[in-house]
């Protein structure tokens, strides 16, 4: 028989087995001893024996995913570090590059040029990388400024270069890579410069490390350069436009008649560069014949205009540049053979580059007549109808364009005054009768011959410039028949010249 104490212990053990999570129930007659007190809580020891393969594969996949993430982060950091180093090297190249500008003569305008930019020297065909002035820097330069102090100093030096190279009225500067001199060593009939300049247009994708050592700046012009000109490119985008001396009437004529991008490019080339300039120049300014470089700003303007008007691609622009260089080579060969370099389309029409303005400032468009086609192709022709001022462009022996104005005090109603400038620089003033339909009724009659007087005068209270000419006449001579026009030119010239005298710096006809 069990004793009472043993029986109580057995019952206590049975109760504990039934309620493992609860405190043991102590019987009333059970005496609590030290052995009955529960030991202090200890960390449960669990023996891990993972024999399930699914748990192992799950843990392995988690480990593999974490490793892949870490590898991806590491590769991105390496790419970022390489990009920062590349940008730092480019900034160092820009900072250390010292380009001495070479003056490139450019005669621009219609028909034989309207401006001469000797003081605006820029480099070759630009690309899409643009750095604005200090107020609007590119985000890449701004980020680099916050990275290291050395890059900060490089950026400040670059900004100083921009400010020193750009006059106060200019705002945008383009960073351009230029082909090295050793890149162009073919003869002139084969090298066009377009291959090198095409590399410039795509220098962001180029892997040639030698191209990175030739960097220069191109300064975009503003409306102040050519107040009477027009924009090439998108006039609403200051980074994709160039101010040109082409007038609005000429630009309308070009846009109307040029249906393809290549034809428009070659037409704009004739308006912007005289054939004499084309003959001694090309796009790259390199070659064995010592050719000069076409004004890269105007070439960039042509590029912007074609991209804006025709949505051309870089491959199209590469082909057009080859055509431009081919046109320059053709002009060079014609000059070597002694052939004429005149633009036929310009000699058959009245140039709209001349400014026709009335006293109220209204511009009038004058249509060309058949008489203008019969005159010498060496002379510049201007027709004036119901206006009081005509602008004269004359190209000097040095290639400079001299601009003057011819002031006429009064024009008889229903008549036109045709001003012809001969090869010697003298002005021949003719009277032309024009019908209501715009047709010339009778041939032009020479009424005066005048030369420019550098002395200043006054016309209606406005001072004359140095190259201005004032012609006053009270009564015009009777108009001769068309058949007798040629015979009447010389007698009229000799008869009218004694009646001309200079008074207060102006040439007057009595």
UniProtKB/Swiss-Prot annotation:
In this chain the BEN domain maps to: 239-335
Q: Quick one: where's region Disordered?
A: 178-212, 343-371
Q: Does the keyword Flavoprotein apply?
A: no
What are the BP-aspect GO terms? chromatin organization
Nucleus among keywords: yes
Q: Where is it mostly found?
A: nucleus
Supply one GO molecular-function term.
DNA binding
A Pfam family of this chain = BEN
Task: Name the residue ranges with Polar residues bias.
Answer: 193-212, 360-371
Q: What does this protein do?
A: DNA-binding protein which may repress cyclin D1 transcription by recruiting HDAC1 to its promoter, thereby diminishing H3K9ac, H3S10ph and H4K8ac levels. Promotes activation, which causes cell cycle arrest.
Family to which this protein belongs: Belongs to the BANP/SMAR1 family.
Q: What name does UniProt use for this protein?
A: Protein BANP
Q: Which organism is it from?
A: Xenopus tropicalis
Upper lineage is: Eukaryota, Metazoa, Chordata, Craniata, Vertebrata
**What gene is this protein translated from?**
banp
């Amino acid at each position: 028989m069990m004793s009472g104490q043993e029986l109580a212990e057995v019952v206590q053990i049975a109760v504990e087995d039934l309620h493992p999570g609860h405190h043991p129930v102590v019987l009333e007659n059970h005496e609590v001893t030290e052995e009955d007190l529960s030991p202090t809580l200890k960390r449960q020891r669990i023996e891990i024996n993972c024999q399930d393969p699914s748990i192992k594969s799950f843990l392995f996949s988690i480990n593999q995913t974490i490793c892949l993430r870490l590898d991806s982060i590491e590769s991105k950091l390496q790419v970022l570090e390489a990009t920062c180093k590349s940008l730092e090297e480019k900034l160092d190249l820009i900072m250390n590059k010292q380009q001495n500008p070479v003056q490139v003569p450019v005669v621009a305008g219609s028909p034989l040029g309207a401006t001469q930019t000797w003081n605006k020297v820029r480099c070759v065909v630009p690309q899409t990388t643009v750095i604005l002035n200090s107020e609007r820097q590119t985000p890449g330069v701004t980020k680099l400024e916050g990275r290291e102090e050395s890059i900060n100093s490089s950026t400040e030096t670059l900004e100083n270069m921009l400010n020193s190279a750009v006059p106060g009225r200019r705002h945008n500067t383009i960073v351009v890579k230029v082909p090295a001199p050793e890149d162009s060593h073919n003869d002139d009939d084969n090298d066009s410069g377009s291959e090198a300049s095409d590399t410039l247009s795509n220098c962001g994708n180029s892997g040639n490390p030698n191209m990175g050592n030739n960097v220069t700046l191109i300064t975009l012009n503003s409306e102040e350069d050519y107040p009477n000109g027009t924009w090439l490119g998108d006039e609403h985008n200051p980074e994709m436009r160039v101010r040109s001396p082409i007038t609005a009437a000429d630009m309308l004529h070009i846009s109307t008649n040029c249906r393809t991008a290549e034809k428009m490019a070659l037409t704009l080339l004739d308006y912007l560069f005289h054939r004499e300039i084309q003959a001694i120049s090309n796009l790259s300014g390199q070659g064995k014949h010592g050719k000069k470089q076409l004004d890269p700003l105007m070439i960039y303007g042509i590029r912007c205009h074609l991209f804006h008007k025709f949505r051309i691609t870089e491959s199209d622009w590469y082909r057009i540049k080859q055509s431009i260089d081919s046109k320059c080579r053709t002009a060079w060969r014609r000059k070597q053979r002694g052939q004429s370099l005149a633009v036929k389309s310009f000699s058959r029409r009245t140039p709209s580059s001349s400014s026709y303005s009335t006293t109220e400032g209204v511009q009038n468009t004058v249509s060309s007549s058949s008489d203008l086609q019969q005159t010498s192709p060496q002379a510049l022709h201007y027709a004036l109808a119901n206006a009081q001022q005509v602008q004269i462009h004359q190209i000097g022996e040095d290639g400079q364009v001299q601009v003057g104005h011819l002031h006429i005090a009064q024009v008889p109603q229903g008549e036109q005054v045709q001003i012809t400038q001969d090869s010697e620089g003298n002005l021949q003033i003719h009277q032309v009768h024009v019908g209501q339909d715009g047709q010339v009724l009778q041939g032009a009659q020479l009424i005066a011959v005048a030369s420019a007087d550098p002395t200043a005068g006054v016309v209606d209270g406005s001072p004359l410039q140095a190259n201005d000419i004032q012609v006053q006449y009270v009564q015009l001579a009777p108009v001769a028949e068309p058949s007798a026009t040629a015979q009447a030119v010389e007698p009229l010239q000799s008869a009218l010249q004694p009646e001309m005298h200079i008074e207060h710096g102006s040439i007057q006809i009595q």
